[in-house]
């Protein structure tokens, strides 16, 4: 699985 982290 690919986990994407979204910067804020």
Swiss-Prot record:
Leftover remarks: On the 2D-gel the determined pI of this protein is: 5.7, its MW is: 35.1 kDa.
Record protein name field: Putative LRR disease resistance protein/transmembrane receptor kinase PS4
Species of origin: Pinus strobus
Lineage: Eukaryota, Viridiplantae, Streptophyta, Embryophyta, Tracheophyta
């Amino acid at each position: 699985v690919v986990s994407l982290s979204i910067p804020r």
